[in-house]
Amino acid sequence: MKFLVINGPNLNLLGLREPAIYGSRDFAVLQDFIRAAAHEAGVEVELFQSNHEGAIVDAIQAAYGTADGIVINPAAYTHTSVAILDALKAVALPAVEVHLSDVSTREPFRQISYAGMACVKTYMGLGFEGYRQAILYLRQYLEEANA
């Protein structure tokens, strides 16, 4: 089983960007955490990060036929990108949305998630642990769907 894990804009600045919200661990630590969580779950992961909406859309499209599912933290594009929503719907791979912070308790403009409309589940406010939960959930979801 293989998952594409997508991280959107500014996540490459973890540790620098608003540590009171996102924590002090940097992006390399997050990548290591995701790899370890995938290994523990017995799944393969491909990691992708971009600050560019079109590159994220391209990565989602490229996952068709090469990945079994997607874990996505679209970051700021969560609240603005119909293009990412449409790409997720087009490839029709099961996807799980992750947010480090609890976006439901933040600014009003963060209350809508376009990407979440195409996802089977969302984890928010769990920090890095949200990625582990997403990987485990997606594995279980696929196992049950293929049973």
Spans of features found by a protein language model:
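Helix-loop-strand module that forms the ligand-binding subsite of alpha/beta enzymes
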Residues: I72-R110
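Short acidic active-site motifs
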Residues: A55-A59
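Extreme N-terminal starter segment of soluble prokaryotic enzymes
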Residues: M1-L4
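Short beta->alpha junction loops
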Residues: E46-G54
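Short, glycine-/small-residue-rich phosphate/pyrophosphate-handling segment
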Residues: V96, T105-A147
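Glycine- and acidic-residue-enriched helix-capping/strand-helix junction motifs
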Residues: L14-A28
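Short acidic/histidine-rich motifs immediately flanking catalytic phosphotransfer sites
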Residues: A63-I70
